[in-house]
Structures are given as C-alpha cells and as structure tokens.
Amino acid sequence: MAPRSFPENPYILLTPGPLSTSPTVKAVMMRDWCTWDRDYNAIVQDIRERLVALATAGAGYTSVLMQGSGTFAVEAALGTALPHDGKLLVISNGHYGDRMALIAGYLGMRSAKLDFGETGRPDPDRVRDTIESDPAITHVAVVHCETTTGMLNPVEEIGRAVKSLGRVFIVDAMSSFGGIPMDIATLGADFLISSANKCIQGVPGFGFVIARRSELEQCAGRSRSLSLDLFQQWKEMETKGGKWRFTSPTHVVRAFAQALNELDDEGGVACRNARYRENRRILTAGMRALGFECLLPEALQSPIITSFLTPGRPGFNFNSLYQELKSRGFVIYPGKVSEADTFRIGTIGHVFPEDMHRLVKAAKDAMHRFG
C-alpha cells in the first residue's frame, strides 16, 4: 500500500511514545515476513549493527533486540546483568527510576535506591559517596531522560563516578537514544537500554540493549527469566544470523529498519535533536504566552517532553483541555508528578515546528472556552 493511500490519522500524538510515525514507516508494515527467512534475519542483523554505530564510534560493543515494551528490555537487562550475589543501586528522580527499583524487588535482587525526589537533579557526588559507603554494590542504574518531568539527568557525570569505582553502569536511555547526541563509551555505560517507539520513531513491539561485549559475555546463567534472558537472546542472534529465540514482531522490525533510514535521511541524531529542540522552543514560548508555567527550570529540561503546571484558573481542568485539543487534532499527556498538579506535552516523533505552531493556536482557542 502506498503511503498516500493511508487514511490520515485523526490526531498528532504529543506524547513520550508511542508517538506519531511517518506514512512510510507505516507503509512498510503491509508485508508479512517469515521469522526463519534469511532476508528477514538480515534486516535484524543490519539493525543491530546500525544501533551500535549510533551508540558509539568505539569498539567492543554489541546489541540485542528483545520482544515487548521498553520495560521488558529494562527487566531483561537488569535480570541478566546482575549476578545472584550482586547488588543494584538505582538512582531515581521519577516514576521510571522507581520502576527499576520495583523490578529489582520483583526479581528478588539485593538493591538500594538513592532517591532525589521528582524535581531533584541527581548529584554525582552523592552517588559516589553512596557507592563508597556500600562495597556490596556491584551495579548502578539511572534513567537518562526521566519523562515523569522531562528532566535530562547528568548521566555522563554519574558514569564517571560509577566507573572510577569499578562498578557496572546501566543507563535507561528509553526516551533519549536517537534524539539526544550521546556516545555510550563517553557515558561509561556498560548496558544502554531503549525502545523502538521513541526517538528513532518506529512503532511499539520491541526494545533493545546496547552492551559492552565483555560485560555481556559474563552474563551466561544469570537471568531470572526464560523469555527475558538477554544473554541467550544475544547468543542466538550472534550465532544464528539474527534469529530470535521466540517469535519476533516482524512488522515492527521492518518498520524500525525504515525508521533508521529516515533518521539518516534527516541528517542523523544531531539534526533530529535540533528539530526536537525547535519544537520545544515554539511550544514553551507559546504556552507561556497563554499563562502556563513549566515545572522545571530550563537548565534541567530535555527537548523530549515538557511538564506544565496546571493553572489555578476557574473552570480549568486537564480532562477538558485534553478533549478540546483532541477535537482539534492533538493528543497530550496527563501529569505523573505527585508533588504538583501538571500535564505534559511531548515534542518528539514525526512532529515538526509547524505542528507546534498549530498546537499553540489550538491551545489558545481551547483556553477561550474556559473563559
């Protein structure tokens, strides 16, 4: 089916993912694939190589794809990376850091959480002090872009502290990889986790882990799960030409390969980041002009998603704003912060500056309805 023959989506998704995708990403999903076919597995291998190339110019890294949402990939990485006598330190300043701590609890791991609060920037010195005070800690995990608020955490500084003390560093780059320039070697990350349906602008269905090969090779027999055994999945892909251990989301994989092509066509991560930053600049300028305030100071804010404080305006509520904007072609996100009444608007995906100008106009029209 040609892209132009698709019905137009009734709204643009201004969310942290799943997000709006291009017509051409959708179009390539109209073909069926056999999971055992060499042509299909060649696509998988190409994706794996391209992910590593996106992550670093350095040597010694590999990648593995894992069925399911991004959380499946996080659980696979945590559940496979930690030895049974290891201990995980989770650095948290939001829902997704808390989720990693929750996963550790479910898996019966020894773990500790260093909590900076939902609007607090993680302090690398406190991370260092915490590790030094507990020699049992073997692995440290942190979220790069905490979409609870939209904060971009100082992962490079944290990584320097972690690696200087000889610990394994795990980075949840779910909502940043492909949209924010980074080098996994510079970050010091031994495992970096992301998902198909975020900044690379594919569709939901699998996550992936980019790992230091020497670390992943040590993970045999560690997994607490059969289907989420990251080492065995990697070994299968390595030795059998891209084959997955269990049924893979074939259409999603093909869409992701197309999304990678479109990232290249856009000029790579730096150019995509520039578009996201311009999207956010237009959004925040327009929303501030309408009287909305951002939750975070600019110095802490990512270009991925922005949390706005709900105004104390008579008659205003999020659900009404949501419906007004949806009727005008935009879907936004409710807040996730417990410390304040907020809502969120994403600026990633197949979304462009002209879309943000239209959103601001729609928000202005919607606000008139509230008086």
Curated annotation (Swiss-Prot):
The lineage of its organism: Bacteria, Pseudomonadati, Thermodesulfobacteriota, Syntrophobacteria, Syntrophobacterales. GO terms for biological process: organic phosphonate catabolic process. HAMAP family: PhnW_aminotrans_5. Keywords: Aminotransferase, Pyridoxal phosphate, Pyruvate, Transferase. The modification N6-(pyridoxal phosphate)lysine is found at K198. Involved in phosphonate degradation. Pfam families: Aminotran_5. The keyword Plastid does not apply. It catalyses: (2-aminoethyl)phosphonate + pyruvate = phosphonoacetaldehyde + L-alanine. This is 2-aminoethylphosphonate--pyruvate transaminase. The gene is phnW.
